Structure formats: structure tokens, C-alpha cells
Amino acid sequence: MNVDLHMHTHCSDGVYEPEQLAQMAVDAGLAVISITDHDTIAAYDGSHHFPASLRIIPGIELSSDYGGEDIHVLGYYIDPHHEAIQSYSRQFRQRRLKRAMQMVDKCISLGYVVDKNQIEALLQKGGTVGRPHLAKMMVERGYYPDIKTVFDKLLYRGGPAYIPYHRYTVDQCIDLIHQAGGIALLAHPGMIKQKLDPILQFQFDGIEVYHPENRGHFDEYSRLAVQKHWLVSGGSDYHGVPRRYPEQVGVFCVDADNVRELLQYRD
């Protein structure tokens, strides 16, 4: 049985609507998924209808700052209706909109024609808006051939149209997830540039062992989980963005036996 516990939808920086992603997961033969959109629980607001045959673990991926680097914290089994997570999602959404508008202004100052109304319209669906949405607009207007090129040329961190954003501390992210009844796991450690040891001292409940950027380190992170008595998770980090691996749901997935304790956490 295959699962994917790290996926993104249009509610944050993915391409597809939650219903579309869920159906793609079913079509790919996945039995369990978790939609872990960045800093929002909009996929779980009750307006989306998912296939009955698919188990979905409520999740989120929170953005934190440690040592000037973006450290992501995955939350599983959160209560999407808990006031703490609802409040965070609302506040983050407003900050994200402000940031998106600032990036639009930068693009306009650079000579691009961008419609602010399109950005605001995206917010009507209850999710967040960010660089991928702006990049998609730039591609649609013919400025660049694909989303990756927009990031490489314009929206990369420190790029001509980039605007920094406020992030919680790692501790704050873990506390928020716990308040909402969930468990907090360190996301994709293979992507972290600084030394891991100080980060591993935070009160995580687990670690994302299986991730495309962790290749070559699966055994190392598995041993770490055993040493710390941590839960193990894994997923594709699927966004549906062209030229970003994996390009299809189910290409990178995890055997359920490798994440059995997490799957049975609430049984």
C-alpha cells in the first residue's frame, strides 16, 4: 500500500484544487495522503469533497525561521477548526496578500503588465497567494516560457521582484501544531543547508525521512528517528509545477509499512 503525506494544492503554492489532487491520488493508486499546504488549512474548510475511498490525514506545513534559513515544520492530525490554527491561517493569508501585492508592484516597476485584480481573485477561494501564482500569471502573459524560469530570473530569494516575509520561530510552529491537536515533524531535512544538530534539539514528534531531497540519506534519517523515538513520515512534496520533480502524482510515494506508526497514531 502506497501513501503520500506531503502534497500541496492551489490553496497555497500548488497547481491543482484539493478535489483534483485527491482524485489524482486515487487514480495513481494511493491509499492515504495528507494535503500539507503552506501555512493554510483552506483545503479542509468543508467546501471540498473528496473520494470516499481515499484516507486523508489533515495536515499543514508551517514556515519558520532558524539561523536565517526557512525551516519547514509538518503538522499531522491537526484539527482544522481549532481557533489557534484558524487565526494563524487568517493572519498569514493577509500578510501573504500584502506581500504578493508588493511583488506585483515591483514587477510593474520593472516594466511588466500585471493585473492586481487577478491576485485578489485568487484569495476569494480562501487560500493564500504567493510567488507560484504570480509566476503563473507571468507565463500566461507570455513573459517567460515556464514557471521555473520566472523563479530563476525574477522571483528567487533576493531576486528583482522578491519580497521577504515574516516567519514564526521553530518553537512557535511546534507549539501551534500541538495546540491544534496535531503532531509536529521536521520537514525534508535534506534541504536544510546549515548543520542539523541544533535544529534536532527542538521538541519535534518526528521527522520526514522519505522525500525526494533526502535521497541518499533515508537510512541515516531512519536511524535518527529510532534514536530519538520519533515518528517517521514521507511524501513527494508534490506541487504540480512543470519541471519540478515529481511532475506526476504517484511517481514518488512511500510504502505504508515505512510510516506505519504515524498512520496508526490515532487508531
Predicted regions and their residues:
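A short acidic, helix-capping loop that chelates divalent metal ions and anchors anionic groups
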Residues: 84, 243-245
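Extended substrate/RNA-proximal surfaces in nucleic-acid metabolism proteins
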Residues: 49-197, 258-263
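Short, basic/aromatic-enriched C-terminal tail that caps enzymatic domains
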Residues: 246-267
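An N-terminally biased module of ancient metal coordination in phosphate/nucleic-acid-related enzymes
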Residues: 1-70, 153-156, 160, 173-178, ...
